[in-house]
Amino acid sequence: SQHGLSMQDMRTVSRLLHAIGDFERIGDHALNLQESAKELHEKQLTFSTIAREEVDVLTSLLEDLLNSALRSFQSDDPQMARQVEPLEETMDLLTEEIRSRHIRRLQSGQCTIQLGSILNDLLNNAERVGDHCSNIAVSVIEEQEKQAASHAYLHSLKKNDEFSFQLQQNLSRYVL
C-alpha cells in the first residue's frame, strides 16, 4: 500500500512482534524444562519429598502465570493482565526461597550437587518464563492505555495497594 501503516497500526505490529518473541522464548524455556525432566528420568534421579513438594508448588504457580498471561493477551484485557505481575513477583520470591532451602539441604547432605544443578535449571527456566509472561501482560496494558513506558509502569505498579494485596494472596496460595 502507498499509504503505509498508521501510528496506531505500527504500535500494534510492534507489540505483536515483541509478544511473538516472548512466546518463542517461553517455548524455548519449556523445552529446557522438558530436558531437565528427561535427565531426571534417564538417570533415575529423584528429588527428596520436600523438594518434590516445592517443585509441585512452583509448577502450579507457573501454570497459573502462563494461563493468566495468555488469557490477557488473547482477550486484550488489561484488568486480567494486571494479575500477571503479582504472580511473577510471587515466582521470584518462591524461586529465591527454594534456592535457599536447597542450599541448606545441600549443606546438610540431604541433596546432591547433581540434583541441585537440575533444580537450579528448573528454577532459572521458571523465572524466565515468568519474566516473559510479565512482558506480554505489560504489552496488553500499554496497548489499552496507549502508553509505552513499561519500566515506569512496573515501578509504579509495585507501589500500588492492589499489587500488594494480590501478592499477599498469592503468597498464601503458593505455600512451600
Outline where the language-model segments fall.
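Cytosolic, long alpha-helical scaffolding segments
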Residues: 1-176
